[in-house]
């Protein structure tokens, strides 16, 4: 199995390391790769859109020709996980977006960009997961905020206290936080099971 981490900007290497460790823990043969060109898409069983800066990721996905084929693959059922800026890229509606920004618009949520403020307002906190009783340490860095679920297809996947901070819709996972910045691979393992 190959998992493509869109490697244009953001915390790509951390996702590659977390994915490779999760594959090993699941006993699955495979690897995570830096996904930079459309021709690599035929190799992958799943895609991760990392954190970073959503405007830059959007622009580079369009410039490299990844934008439209990635959107089509997701719409056709390819598993995808977006974290932080990746969540913004997946979202149907984005508050605070500039008119020239394009998003994949495949996940039925409304998000607010940079809802947690500046870099100095970043924090870590225990997050409750729908698929495991043990808390997960969520790392929130200038994170977007899920402000509304726009359809019944979207299911909460993670909560910070009583607020939804992660969602799942069929083959799509969107997270406000960065699961790749911890040593805990449970979120990556859960995601990879979608591609098995």
From Swiss-Prot:
Assembly: In the presence of PdxS, forms a dodecamer of heterodimers. Only shows activity in the heterodimer.
Amino-acid positions noted as binding L-glutamine in the UniProt annotation, renumbered to this chain: 52-54, 113, 141-142
NCBIfam families per the UniProt record, alphabetical: PLP_synth_Pdx2
Active site: 84 (nucleophile), 178 (charge relay system), 180 (charge relay system)
GO cellular component entries: cytosol; glutaminase complex
One Pfam family here: SNO
Job of this protein: Catalyzes the hydrolysis of glutamine to glutamate and ammonia as part of the biosynthesis of pyridoxal 5'-phosphate. The resulting ammonia molecule is channeled to the active site of PdxS.
GO MF entries: glutaminase activity; pyridoxal 5'-phosphate synthase (glutamine hydrolysing) activity
Gene that this sequence comes from: pdxT
Catalysed conversion reaction: aldehydo-D-ribose 5-phosphate + D-glyceraldehyde 3-phosphate + L-glutamine = pyridoxal 5'-phosphate + L-glutamate + phosphate + 3 H2O + H(+); L-glutamine + H2O = L-glutamate + NH4(+)
Keyword RNA-binding applies: no
Name of this chain's protein: Pyridoxal 5'-phosphate synthase subunit PdxT
Pathway stated in the Swiss-Prot or TrEMBL entry: Cofactor biosynthesis; pyridoxal 5'-phosphate biosynthesis
GO biological process: glutamine catabolic process; pyridoxal phosphate biosynthetic process; pyridoxine metabolic process
Keywords: Glutamine amidotransferase, Hydrolase, Lyase, Pyridoxal phosphate
Originating organism: Pyrococcus abyssi (strain GE5 / Orsay)
Family: Belongs to the glutaminase PdxT/SNO family.
Protein EC: 4.3.3.6, 3.5.1.2
